[in-house]
Design a protein with these regions (language model features):
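Conserved class I S-adenosyl-L-methionine
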Residues: 1-36, 48-52, 71, 132-161, ...
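Class I SAM-dependent methyltransferase SAM/SAH-binding core
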Residues: 38-42, 46-90
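A short acidic, Gly/Pro-enriched loop at the edge of an enzyme's catalytic core
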Residues: 89-101
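A short SAM/SAH-binding and catalytic strip from SAM-dependent methyltransferases
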Residues: 100-114
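A short glycine-rich, Lys/Arg-flanked "PGG" loop and its adjoining helix->strand segment in the class I
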Residues: 117-129
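Short alpha-helix
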Residues: 160-176
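Conserved Class I S-adenosyl-L-methionine
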Residues: 178-249
Length: 249
């Protein structure tokens, strides 16, 4: 698991920067009702996506929440007065506070399945009837684009995806949310190169391959034999799911 306090300084540049943030914000906003008045961005990170939502929808009262102090500090510098330090598993808001709740690239980071379930439960709890929850799903799978890099890494150990689409849908249903749509967007600038993937392996980005593990070095050696070491392979394509809390009465 990465330390997001340390990651904060270089987070934007290492995650596709502004092009990816723009694509994410545009797609998420396309699933937020036009009459929404209050939106919560859970796990907002450095607010690269959040600030684009604010700029595109000045009618929305937008709040961002993140647990990592480093991330929240950077987010608050971009959106003063709109960022709170909060655990997504215990959101500090009353039931039914928001017309829309989003979580972009958050669920896959949860330590275990119970934590992911708690995040979805909290997002559902603070959503008003008729509101929409929008979240990314299947993030790890999005990076498998059928490239030679993916072929080398095919045998790597993997943990069960906390954000598997079917799992997230089941969590949502358990808390009264119904499917309300699906969309996708490209992870612009995030196509992997062999040399960059080797660096990511050695930094611990692949959860079950820790720095210094002999298996990590075997995969790194396989990547080092690939041609065009600095040529990015195709960009990933991220999937977004929307869920709504039905109106009652």
């Amino acid at each position: 698991m990465l330390d997001y306090e340390k990651e904060a300084a270089g987070y934007d540049a290492s995650r596709g920067g502004e092009p990816r943030a723009r694509a994410a914000a545009d797609t998420v906003l396309g699933m937020v009702p036009a009459d929404a008045a209050r939106l919560l961005d859970v796990g907002c990170g450095t607010a690269t996506v959040t600030r684009r939502i604010v700029a595109a929808r000045p009618d929305l009262q937008v709040i961002g929440a993140d647990l990592a102090h480093g991330m929240a500090r950077r987010a608050a510098a971009r959106l003063p007065g709109r960022i709170v330090l909060a655990d997504a598993r215990r959101l500090p808001f009353p039931d039914g506070t928001f017309d829309a709740v989003i979580s972009v690239w958050l669920l896959h980071l949860m330590p275990d399945a119970t934590d992911a379930r708690r995040v979805v439960a909290e997002c559902a709890r603070v959503l008003r009837p008729g509101g929409v929850y929008v979240t990314t799903v299947d993030k790890a799978a999005a990076h498998d684009v059928g490239s030679d890099i993916d072929a080398v890494l095919a045998a790597r150990p993997r943990r069960p995806a906390r954000d598997a689409a079917e799992t997230v849908a089941a969590h949502a249903a358990e808390h009264g949310l119904r499917p309300a749509g699906q969309a996708a967007f490209p992870g612009l600038g995030q196509g992997r190169s062999p040399r960059g993937t080797i660096a990511d392996l050695r930094r611990g980005w692949f959860t079950l391959l820790t720095p210094g593990d002999p298996r990590t070095e075997r995969f790194a050696a396989g990547l080092a034999r690939l041609p065009d070491q600095d040529r990015p392979r195709p960009d990933p394509r991220f999937t977004v799911r929307a869920f709504t809390r039905p109106r009652t009465g």
